[in-house]
């Protein structure tokens, strides 16, 4: 059967297309992912668990937890974003030969939203390349930014090693007017013979600043070169994982080898999570996998187990069992155990959270 949320989204996009050219071709069902009966049942379980049901217990005091976002809705949103990025990247001549996008990350904020230059980033993973998309907005009035680039320097997660990423080119944004967004792309070649690698990117925004001549309302001919340091960006293990459904988590988890090359484990305190519900939401995003068996819903305020599953961009299985505990004294403590069919990916995934 087809994924109904994605099918609905694609049909809406098709029938509401502004261009008449869209109707010159029939609707393409091949763009809609097919889901199994197990996946459909998993969705039903999630919806039932996240829908309020009558209870005989007296209502408890305190704020009510926010309803969890359905995994079907999240999958549809991610699918739509991935298709949008794929179309945009394929239309860029310098990137058109890279092939299909294996995965695009969520949007990462590299500045505060109130700063003069607002910058976000998306990591696009290809078979042989990593492309970082920087979306930039200049909020300064009466000023334009010309020849906007980002100096992006990768270092390995382990400082004693080389990242292996080789910068090939940068596609600058020619001109950024006030409150008009623009995009800079930086392309790196992935290291040969290394399917998965982690890296940290330092980022510096560089541009020529020009004031607007009030008499002509045009930028002045000459400006001055300037730069603006923005937040670092990390390439982590979860960037190589796509969420996936499965019918029996325990069977999959126990079927993956548990030696040092296939399993990684870490116990840590989550200082930025005040409840198990917050910790669950944070870890689902950080680990980049699909919650199974309704485990994204916390039914206790003291202990919880989160079961996550996904597949790497090369097709290998990845599963994570997260055990959590909360106490008023120590806050949220989590034990994260990840197993992967492919060597060393589990360690990269855990390292991206620790």
Q: At which residue positions do the language-model features occur?
A:
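Beta-rich interaction modules in large eukaryotic scaffold/regulatory proteins
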Residues: 99-132, 136-354
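Acidic, serine/threonine-rich low-complexity intrinsically disordered linkers/hinges in large eukaryotic
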Residues: 1-120, 129, 239, 252
């Amino acid at each position: 059967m087809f994924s109904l949320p994605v099918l609905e989204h694609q049909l809406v996009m098709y029938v509401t297309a502004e261009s008449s050219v869209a109707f010159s071709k029939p609707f393409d069902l091949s763009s809609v992912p097919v889901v199994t009966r197990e996946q459909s049942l998993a969705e039903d379980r999630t919806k039932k668990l996240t829908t309020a049901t009558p209870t005989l217990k007296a209502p408890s005091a305190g704020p009510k937890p926010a309803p969890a976002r359905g995994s079907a809705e999240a999958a549809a949103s991610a699918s739509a974003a991935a298709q949008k990025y794929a179309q945009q990247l394929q239309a860029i001549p310098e990137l058109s030969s890279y092939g299909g996008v294996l995965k695009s990350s969520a949007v990462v904020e590299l500045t505060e939203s109130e700063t003069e230059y607002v910058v976000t980033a998306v990591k696009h993973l290809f078979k042989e390349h990593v492309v970082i998309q920087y979306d930039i907005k200049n909020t300064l009035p009466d000023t334009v930014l010309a020849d906007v680039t980002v100096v992006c320097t990768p270092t390995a997660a382990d400082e004693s090693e080389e990242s292996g990423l080789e910068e090939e080119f940068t596609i600058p944004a020619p001109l950024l007017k006030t409150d008009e967004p623009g995009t800079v792309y930086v392309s790196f070649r992935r290291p040969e013979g290394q399917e998965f690698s982690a890296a940290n990117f330092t980022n510096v925004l560089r541009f020529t600043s020009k004031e607007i001549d009030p008499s002509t309302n045009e930028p002045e001919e000459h400006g001055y070169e300037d730069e603006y340091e923005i937040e670092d960006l990390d390439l982590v293990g979860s960037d190589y994982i796509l969420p996936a459904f499965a019918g029996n988590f325990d069977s999959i988890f126990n079927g993956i080898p548990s030696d040092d090359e296939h399993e990684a484990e870490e116990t840590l305190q989550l200082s930025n999570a005040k409840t198990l519900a917050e910790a669950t939401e944070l870890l689902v995003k950080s680990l980049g996998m699909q919650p199974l068996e309704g485990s994204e819903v916390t039914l206790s305020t003291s202990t919880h187990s989160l079961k996550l599953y996904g597949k790497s961009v090369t097709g290998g299985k990845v599963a994570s069992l997260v055990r959590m505990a909360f106490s008023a004294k120590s806050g949220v403590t989590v034990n994260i155990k990840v197993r992967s069919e492919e060597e060393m990916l589990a360690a990269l995934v855990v390292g991206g959270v620790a």
